Amino acid sequence: MKWIEIKIKTTEEACDAISYMLTSIGAGGVAIEDPNEIRRETQKSNSIDYVDDEFLNSLGEDVVVKAYFPGETNVPELVSLIKEKLAFIGTFLNVGEGYCGYAEMDEEDWSNSWKKYYKPLHLTDRLIVKPSWENYDNKDGEIIIEMNPGMAFGTGTHETTKMCAVLLDKYVKDGCRVIDVGCGTGILSIIASKLGAAEVTAVDIDEVAVKVAKENLELNKVDNVRVFKGVLDDIEKEKRDIVVANIIANVIMDISSRVPYYLKKDGLFIASGIIKERKQEVLDECLRKGFECVEIIEMGEWVAIVLRCLDSL
């Protein structure tokens, strides 16, 4: 199958919003190449691979977002739509250089090339995410999450996902009920299940993500997660203990008025995908919607907020 690869150079603060936009207009897959993230990862004391300074210096500063659309797509119409969407995102985020062109490629060329960069990774002291094609000798007490990301977002390497993993590790209790909004590959749903959640309901607007999530659930032998294409409003309004959303600031603020319909009193809303510059804006909006701030953590340029639901609706 042929694919159209769209290339966009942007900034770290705008890459998630752009990725979300590309998925919403029909991208079959989105890849983010963030040189700043690579530098941070390779400079950690527990980094798995050695990377020389010359390579790090060659990375540049731009974040590159690549999106893949079916080969029969009308490219001029697609490019026009993307430029229009980027202009809108540019009204509230610095999108950087923006659209940089497109190329045609075979599915095999892009669906497998990134695998050499995806290695086992510690999300927390006991949570390990590893690609399905890599071996890993787990130690006592470690929880292994196997992933085959395919064309969906969410491998565990991005700070926004890591922060969610850290917070789920802290707040998920045996028998609790969880909702995962914008589940991507299903990584957070799998983590919640393996940490003891009795049931997880996961949704994503992307059909590819739902397919990949279901495959990853099977890979991890997880049978208490229900995943389907949709948004928060498509989930039945039953009371849960935790709603986790690793999405973007605008969507978090948008759904914050409806999350209390899905949470018990004192239930937790874990919101990630927030760029630092918008932390206070998101926090203020959620406080106005009846939440209480429990905890805020930061990694790189990103923020995750834990909010307590004071008034279940």
From Swiss-Prot:
A single MF term (Gene Ontology): protein-lysine N-methyltransferase activity
Catalytic reactions on record: L-lysyl-[protein] + 3 S-adenosyl-L-methionine = N(6),N(6),N(6)-trimethyl-L-lysyl-[protein] + 3 S-adenosyl-L-homocysteine + 3 H(+)
GO biological process, one term: methylation
Gene3D superfamilies (UniProt xref): Vaccinia Virus protein VP39
Keywords attached to this entry: Cytoplasm, Methyltransferase, S-adenosyl-L-methionine, Transferase
Top enzyme category: transferase
UniProt-annotated binding residues for S-adenosyl-L-methionine: 161, 182, 204, 246
Keyword Cytoplasm belongs to the record: yes
Entry EC no(s): 2.1.1.-
UniProt main location, coarse: cytoplasm
Described purpose of this protein according to its UniProt entry: Methylates ribosomal protein L11.
Name of the protein in question: Ribosomal protein L11 methyltransferase
Taxonomic source organism: Acetivibrio thermocellus (strain ATCC 27405 / DSM 1237 / JCM 9322 / NBRC 103400 / NCIMB 10682 / NRRL B-4536 / VPI 7372)
Gene: prmA
